Amino acid sequence: MGDVYELVLSADIRADVTDDELAELRWHVGEGPRPEWLPIGSDRYVETYPLGDPDDPDCEWENAEAEPVFAQRGAARRVGGALVAELVARERSDGWALTVRQELHPDDFYRLRTLLDWLGRCSVDAHAGGAGFFVGYLRFHESVEIAPLVLSNGRIHVPEDIETHTPYWEDTGL
């Protein structure tokens, strides 16, 4: 795990997210079981493995299981400090507060990007007149420079590190 990144994220999520979306988010932060259906789309980018000769038209393929992105806990291996993820209800039932600090490998960037797209659309400040809001950062574990995550116009704009590691990304605009 040489290519490790530190992810720090803080977002306020609207109260009108569906129960199914909330169940998937709870699974991602380690606060619930994996739902049968993943409406955020966390299962769109799972690896597929051939169970034989991939050139054989009758070859069967096995799909990897989707894994939670923010469920790591305990001491960080590379970035120091603790790995955490917390999802709590905001006062007056006006939504949810999410805070995350995780170590991620670039192989996790497709799943991360899926969550960031959803969080951008569902954030309290998603459509705050074009203003940009700092919601976190991504940092290579050996660097002191951070790549900011900025929420603007319903999107969390991802750093170049994520863009270059997710070349086949399809923005479905869900």
Which residues does each predicted region cover?
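Charged interaction segments
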Residues: 27-28, 48-174
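Short, extreme N-terminal segment that most often corresponds to the first beta-strand
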Residues: 1-37
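A compositional/structural signature for long, glycine/proline-rich flexible linkers
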Residues: 32, 41-51
